[in-house]
């Protein structure tokens, strides 16, 4: 069946286009709390609800609309987590200036392969740009979330992707500072905590240095 302009809006105006902030929010749905990893996606319904609320998928439709017909919920959740883990690994790699893991790259490439296909379509005025979907709705949603990070790499801005230097945080963020030296996802929280920790360490070290040293034991006479 030929596509028509009324059925497919131009991709650049598509209301499900994601931003880099959306991608990072997706990556940060797994985080450290009190030293333990906490996954906001405990079930597929959790993941699907997040995708719908974020606008990756049509609002007004429940998680069932995102559930692939050929897999169960556990497999669908595993797919979401696998793409998220792969994108996080890529973010960590570029943040630390190291090559990304080959398996992670393969996972991301599988995700973006499901991106909608851009097409020329008939319109009342002659022709316009439309799109058609390649994968199932979940594939398409994950492709949309992967796309902004891939775009930053292609645009040569991957060196601004950071992982928070706070070992109890590790959020992924984009460094928009003028000098490109930002280390914390948020200076008011992680940055200040790090400064406070360094201050406590200096005070402790200073107090240790000022402790009186025990007197050396008196020399005892040795027998002839």
Each predicted region: which residue ranges?
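Short helix-coil boundary/hinge micro-motifs
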Residues: 1-163, 170, 208-224
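Residues immediately within or flanking Cys/His clusters that coordinate Zn2+
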Residues: 161-166, 182, 187, 193
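Aromatic side chains
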Residues: 26, 173-174, 199
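Residue-level signal for short amphipathic helical patches enriched in basic/charged
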Residues: 156-159, 176, 191
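Short acidic, gly/pro-rich beta-turn/loop elements at beta-sheet edges
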Residues: 37, 174, 195
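Basic DNA-binding region of bZIP-type proteins
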Residues: 188-209
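Short linker/helix segments within small regulatory modules
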Residues: 175-182
């Amino acid at each position: 069946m030929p596509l028509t302009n009324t059925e497919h809006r131009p991709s650049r105006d598509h209301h499900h286009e994601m931003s880099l902030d959306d991608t990072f929010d997706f990556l940060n749905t797994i985080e450290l709390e009190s030293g333990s990893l906490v996954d906001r996606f405990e079930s597929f319904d959790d993941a699907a609800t997040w995708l719908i609320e974020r606008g990756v998928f049509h609002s007004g439709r429940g998680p069932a609309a995102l559930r692939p017909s050929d897999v169960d919920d556990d497999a669908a959740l595993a797919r979401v987590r696998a793409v998220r883990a792969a994108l996080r690994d890529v973010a960590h790699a570029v943040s630390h200036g190291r090559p990304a893991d080959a398996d992670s790259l393969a996972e991301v490439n599988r995700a973006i392969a499901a991106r909608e296909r851009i097409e020329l379509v008939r319109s009342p005025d002659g022709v316009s740009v439309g799109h058609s979907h390649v994968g199932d709705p979940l594939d398409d949603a994950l492709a949309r979330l992967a796309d902004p990070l891939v775009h930053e790499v292609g645009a040569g801005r991957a060196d601004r992707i950071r992982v928070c230097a706070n070992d109890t945080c590790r959020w992924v963020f984009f460094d928009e500072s003028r000098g490109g030296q930002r280390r914390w996802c948020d200076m008011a929280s992680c940055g200040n905590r790090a400064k406070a920790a360094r201050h406590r360490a200096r005070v402790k070290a200073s107090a240790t240095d000022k402790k009186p040293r025990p007197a050396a034991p008196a020399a005892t006479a040795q027998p002839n």
